[in-house]
Amino acid sequence: MRVLIKNGIVVNADGQAKQDLLIESGIVRQLGTDISPQLPCEEIDASGCYVFPGGVDVHTHFNIDVGIARSCDDFFTGTRAAACGGTTTIIDHMGFGPNGCRLRHQLEVYRGYAAHKAVIDYSFHGVIQHINHAILDEIPMMVEEGLSSFKLYLTYQYKLNDDEVLQALRRLHESGALTTVHPENDAAIASKRAEFIAAGLTAPRYHALSRPLECEAEAIARMINLAQIAGNAPLYIVHLSNGLGLDYLRLARANHQPVWVETCPQYLLLDERSYDTEDGMKFILSPPLRNVREQDKLWCGISDGAIDVVATDHCTFSMAQRLQISKGDFSRCPNGLPGVENRMQLLFSSGVMTGRISPERFVELTSAMPARLFGLWPQKGLLAPGSDGDVVIIDPRQSQQIQHRHLHDNADYSPWEGFTCQGAIVRTLSRGETIFCDGTFTGKAGRGRFLRRKPFVPPVL
């Protein structure tokens, strides 16, 4: 299979140029002006469009069972939506397994979930839900098998205490793995939640009030300090929602500590006023949506380089599930938002087209830095000879309004309903194969490949 993309503006994190791009057998073979292939190939005219590396979303939750519900997107519908939004690689956060289970148990379960369903290439983050000698001994073996990142939780059922966190940080660091963490102070949240429930205050807005930004920021500061105690272990903070936590991360970075951070479109573009709408339960996620002042602080981090990655935390529960389970009580509502299809378009529109970020910075946030941090570079996140032919073509001249009925996930709503975006995803290629074109999904279940990721190597801070 040969594909020649002509006349587009090819953008990588380190620059852009109007040039052609030749893909053969799923691999980028040549970039240059006026490429004339010696053999027949499919030609795609990208005149007036940006040609970006396919998106790498390093934070999804497909087919996750949270105890009270299972998310409504599996690895087919979830990766289909990703493909239609210009994302060609996902790294899924595996959910909690049975009490006391080994790391391998969840890996085998999740490989079974994805094997015959994934449309695009995929990998997984391990999840450490308890610490014992067997788990610590298993970590190096998992890294050898291509899982080079693991997630810890400071809240929820399988939260770790500080001693367990230190043990995990040390062993992961020794084994060549990156520690990722969901940072919220569980005790403070439980106290606030109990206070509201006792007073009969169960409307959606009390979800946000029960998880104030200080709960998140305190946990971020604690993790930074624990990582330092654990021998300057590398640390990745997921789904940052506030500026105080970002200040702590800036300070750590100024002290040359190896810390990185992601945020998500919902924290950049949605705010806490959503909880006071008639459909406020649609927006229950943790950490919760914040106020506009916090949005502005995050945008500063996007613009000045303090934030490294924009991912989605895609975790879809239908409105029907939310209403049936919660019965109007925020504390019973399953957490999470859809968004894997909208990430690239939303950030392009609100970032590149407004002048907040350059096209190169867009690549850094959506594909290049995720690939570097999580052991996929230069196979992913780059358009250069030898890299995978993963491409998203965006036409900046087109304007689109997001409507759920046109999306490809399995949710029954979109938090982005009615958002108007400047710039449209017109084509997605995965390893040279067109899997989305002009509004139509053309991929197939099972074509995605499991990616064995390289051990963690820190990018230059």
UniProtKB/Swiss-Prot annotation:
Catalytic activity reported: D-5-phenylhydantoin + H2O = N-carbamoyl-D-phenylglycine + H(+)
EC category name: hydrolase
GO terms under cellular component: cytosol
Top-level lineage group: Bacteria
Entry's family note: Belongs to the metallo-dependent hydrolases superfamily. Hydantoinase/dihydropyrimidinase family.
Transmembrane segments: none
Subunit structure, interactors included: Homotetramer.
Binding note for cofactor: Binds 2 divalent metal cations per subunit.
Name the record gives this protein: D-phenylhydantoinase
Binding-site positions, a divalent metal cation 1: H59, H61, K151, D313
GO BP: pyrimidine nucleobase catabolic process
Names of the cofactor(s): a divalent metal cation
PANTHER family: COLLAPSIN RESPONSE MEDIATOR PROTEIN, HYDRANTOINASE/DIHYDROPYRIMIDINASE FAMILY MEMBER
MF term (GO), any: hydrolase activity, acting on carbon-nitrogen (but not peptide) bonds, in cyclic amides
Modification N6-carboxylysine occurs at: K151
Residue sites binding a divalent metal cation 2 per the record: K151, H182, H239
Name of the gene encoding the protein in the UniProt record: hyuA
Positions annotated to bind substrate: Y156, S286, N335
Pfam families: Amidohydro_1 (PF01979)
Function as written in the Swiss-Prot or TrEMBL entry: Catalyzes the stereospecific hydrolysis of the cyclic amide bond of D-hydantoin derivatives with an aromatic side chains at the 5'-position. Has no activity on dihydropyrimidines. The physiological function is unknown.
This protein's record includes keyword Cell wall biogenesis/degradation: no
HAMAP family in alphabetical order: D_hydantoinase
Enzyme Commission number: 3.5.2.-
